Curated annotation (Swiss-Prot):
This is Ferredoxin-3. One of its GO terms (biological process) is nitrogen fixation. The keyword Iron-sulfur applies. Keywords: 4Fe-4S, Electron transport, Iron, Iron-sulfur, Metal-binding, Nitrogen fixation, Repeat, Transport.
């Protein structure tokens, strides 16, 4: 199977790996990843005590917030989010044809 690769400015080959998922059990919702990402890829979502996503931000059942890959189509594959994550929550994979 073919994998998307590119060349760096220096002529080295580079295989971008795109954000696929974030482990909600590991994520602490610190927001470092969304600050370092220059593209609208991530979003902070609320979880209730059962670990289910809550749509209503005013809901009293909100336990905590975690980051999610809301728009994977906007990811450029730089992995800056994974490098800055203190809890190693990210799963990245190369783009395959």
């Amino acid at each position: 199977m073919a994998v998307l690769t590119g060349l760096t400015f220096g002529g080295n080959t580079w295989t971008p790996k795109f954000a696929e998922s974030i482990d909600k059990d590991k994520c602490i919702g610190c927001g470092r990843c969304i600050k370092v990402c220059g593209y609208p890829v991530l979003d902070l979502k609320a979880l209730n005590e059962e670990g289910e996503f809550v749509e209503d931000e005013e809901d009293d059942e909100i336990e905590r917030k975690v980051m999610v890959v809301a728009h994977p189509e906007n990811c450029i594959g730089c992995q800056a989010c994974a490098r800055i994550c203190p809890k190693n929550c990210y799963t990245h994979n190369p783009l395959e044809n």
